[in-house]
C-alpha cells in the first residue's frame, strides 16, 4: 500500500514539473566566460567558429572556436579573436569556392564524355598541333 502511494506521489510530482521544463526549451550551449590570453598560435588551429549573442540563457557575447576535441570561448573585442574570425571566414569561402569549381569541372568532363558516347565516330577538334593555326607538323628530314 505504501509503495502504491509513493508511486502516485512521484507521478503527480513529475506531471506537475513537466510543463515547466518543456516551456523553458532546449538546453543551450553557451559560453559563461572568456578564455583569457588566447594566443594566435592556438587560434590558428581552430576548425570553425560561432558567434554567441545575448539571448535566452546565454547572457554573454562571445565567440566559440571549435577545435578537434574542445571548444574555446573568446572575447569578440580581442584583436586575436577578430583576426582568427577573419581568417576562418576566408578559409571557409576558399573551400566553398574550390568545391564549386571542382563540381563545374566535373560537369564539363561529364558533358564531354556524354558527347563522345552519343557520337562515337566524331573526331576531336584538337589536332597534333594542339589547335594552333600557324603551326604545321612536318616530317623530319634525315641526312644520309
UniProtKB/Swiss-Prot annotation:
Cysteine disulfide links: 30-58, 31-73
GO molecular function, one term: chemokine activity
GO biological process: chemotaxis; immune response; inflammatory response; leukocyte migration; lymphoid lineage cell migration
Keyword vocabulary terms for this entry: Chemotaxis, Cytokine, Disulfide bond, Inflammatory response, Secreted, Signal
Pfam families: IL8 (PF00048)
A single cellular component GO annotation: extracellular space
Record protein name field: C-C motif chemokine 25
Domain of life according to the entry: Eukaryota
Biased amino acid composition, Polar residues: 118-127
Annotated signal sequence range: 1-23
Family statement drawn from the similarity comment of this UniProt entry: Belongs to the intercrine beta (chemokine CC) family.
Function, as annotated: Potentially involved in T-cell development. Recombinant protein shows chemotactic activity on thymocytes, macrophages, THP-1 cells, and dendritics cells but is inactive on peripheral blood lymphocytes and neutrophils. Binds to CCR9. Binds to atypical chemokine receptor ACKR4 and mediates the recruitment of beta-arrestin (ARRB1/2) to ACKR4.
Annotated spans, Disordered: 98-144
Tissue: Specifically expressed by thymic dendritic cells. High levels in thymus and small intestine.
Record-linked InterPro entries: Chemokine_CC_DCCL (IPR034133), Chemokine_IL8-like_dom (IPR001811), Interleukin_8-like_sf (IPR036048)
Compartment(s): Secreted
